Amino acid sequence: MLLPETPALLALRQAVRAWTVAFEPRRRVVVALSGGADSLALTAAAVAETDSVDALIVDHRLQPGSDAVARSAADQALALGCRTATVLTVDVAEGGSLEAAAREARYSALRDARTDLPVLLGHTLDDQAETVLLGLSRGSGGRSIQGMAAFDAPWGRPLLGIRRSVTRAACVDLGITPWEDPHNNNPEFTRVRLRHEALPLLEEILGGGVAEALARTATQLREDGEALDEYAEALLLRAVVDGEVEVDTLAEAPTAIRRRALRAWLLQGGAKALTDKQLRAVDALVIDWRGQGGVAIGGGTPEARLVAARRRGRLILGFEDRRRV
């Protein structure tokens, strides 16, 4: 399909072209297509700027008629020039956050179906701004407000510098009607309220440019974070001996680098859903040692908990029988 040369479509093509040059020299990609404006616009630009595009459409089966929506998205993908368009049906786990469960099911299906290709996602600058605000609300440090990466294999996000208004304009230019997901207007979801209430209010109070400023901040923090991670990795290489960490080597490092090294070591050892409180408690074993006991870390089993402890000048990580607690 030959795309018209409108400002919106040219901006999208430039964004996809830049992403491809940086991350996918093979010029072969998969696009995660919902049928919404963002992913449709991304699909059109990807077809124009790469050699091969396969579309994957996930049917969460959470709404009546979702199968028809998925089939329509597949038809649109083929009309735009995708090589293939495949509908993936998933089961969304009940209980807890519906939004989180749907996301987990969707990403799992996309990961399984992508073969060895990167999966392009239609996240825009607006999505990035919302992600930063959500991270701020958690208050868990700079990592939580770094936002989404342009490429976090296998996930690619070429449109992080593109406003949502541009993707909608592109769909108008293409003469295609995007699907409007009812969940995107459901105030039960925190992100929806940020989108429709919090961000517009901030724009009004602060005089505009808030979304761009939040996205710019995320980029700067991610660049800083990547540099700190490199220093932390080098520190960990020096400190780890037979899977254990020498306390004296860690204690010499600046706090930001030391805690990043500890976080990496804990995650490598099987920690799950590591909290700031847990990380600080493990850090205290290094810099505030008073003979305290080990620190329980998420990632254990029903029978045993994962514990970080200090023994003979080293940190060790192992399982402890819950019946002994």
Swiss-Prot record:
CDD domains the record matches: TilS_N (cd01992)
Record carries keyword S-adenosyl-L-methionine: no
E.C. number: 6.3.4.19
Keywords attached to this entry: ATP-binding, Cytoplasm, Ligase, Nucleotide-binding, tRNA processing
Family to which the UniProt record says this protein belongs: Belongs to the tRNA(Ile)-lysidine synthase family.
Compartment(s): Cytoplasm
Taxonomy, superkingdom: Bacteria
InterPro entries xref list: Rossmann-like_a/b/a_fold, TilS/TtcA_N, tRNA_Ile_lys_synt, tRNA_Ile_lys_synt_N, tRNA_Ile_lys_synt_subst-bd
Catalytic activity: cytidine(34) in tRNA(Ile2) + L-lysine + ATP = lysidine(34) in tRNA(Ile2) + AMP + diphosphate + H(+)
Purpose: Ligates lysine onto the cytidine present at position 34 of the AUA codon-specific tRNA(Ile) that contains the anticodon CAU, in an ATP-dependent manner. Cytidine is converted to lysidine, thus changing the amino acid specificity of the tRNA from methionine to isoleucine.
Positions annotated to bind ATP: 34-39
Name of this chain's protein: tRNA(Ile)-lysidine synthase
Domain notes: The N-terminal region contains the highly conserved SGGXDS motif, predicted to be a P-loop motif involved in ATP binding.
Molecular function GO terms recorded: ATP binding; tRNA(Ile)-lysidine synthase activity
Top-level EC class as recorded in UniProt: ligase
Biological process annotations from GO: tRNA modification
SUPFAM superfamilies per the UniProt record, alphabetical: Adenine nucleotide alpha hydrolases-like (SSF52402), MesJ substrate recognition domain-like (SSF82829)
Any one Gene Ontology cellular component term annotated for this protein: cytoplasm
